[in-house]
Amino acid sequence: MTAPLIYLIAGEQSGDAIGARLIHAIRAKRPDATFAGIGGSAMAEQGLTSLFPIRALALMGLLEVLPKIFELKALLRQTVADIQARRPDVLVTIDSPGFTLRVLKALQPTTLRRAHYVAPQVWAWRENRVKHYPGLWDELLCLLPFEPAFFARHNLQARFVGHPVLESGADTGNAERFRARHAIAADAKILTVMPGSRTTEVYRLLPILEQTIRLLPEPVVPVVPLAGPVEAVVRERTASWPIRPILVADTAGKHDAFA
């Protein structure tokens, strides 16, 4: 049996985490499988060499996308050319529909087996986008249990595969350990501050979140779980806060904070 080549594309940190778990799971069943594509640090730990840095795709909103539109088009062409040159057995695109669905569209027509992991949330907004999806993929893998029925109403087959947060160990955290580690009193109120994983989100949301904390009638202990791509920005931007937040970078620490 020929060793399969699986091409994966993840455009942001959440997709990178999903891609890493997918590579690990595939290797458990097919140790001979090889992988190529685009991913971040988590997928790199599983042995993937990314075609280009994932941060090039972690953009949000017109104000961030427009200045880099020509760069993004070049990355799209580079990705499509790499897929066509490698001729993988399967292509798995993970979330980031602004980029991944354009890759799938650019590959048409094709006999390549394609799976899109993390269904576009057209059930939440702009449902009319669903009319553009037929033919883009062979398998649509959903994180939420109601999504297959939604897509079935639009004559699109989809499969519920579970949410990655349930596989991440997020339910194993220990709140008492977190308080002890950071010398937080048992009766102190903790406020989790989540400014996002994209640079634009952080620049836009952190000032609002700081002002919100200032307006609270009771004192709180702000805790900020750090996303890798924006860790340096968050550290810099929160350094001058009058109420210094606890910054949590490690996974176990985040699980404890959420507990």
Predicted regions and their residues:
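Compositionally biased, intrinsically disordered/low-complexity regions enriched for serine, proline
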Residues: 1, 28, 85, 192, ...
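Charged active-site motifs of nucleotide-sugar-dependent glycosyltransferases
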Residues: 3-5, 89, 185-192, 221
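Active-site and donor-binding regions of nucleotide-sugar-utilizing enzymes
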Residues: 4-179, 194-202, 215, 227-229, ...
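Secondary-structure boundary/capping positions in well-ordered alpha/beta enzyme cores
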Residues: 33, 110, 158, 185, ...
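Donor-nucleotide binding loops and adjacent catalytic segments primarily
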Residues: 40-41, 50, 200-259
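A general secondary-structure boundary signal
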Residues: 76, 93, 138, 186-187, ...
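Conserved acidic residues
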Residues: 88-89, 138, 189, 256-259
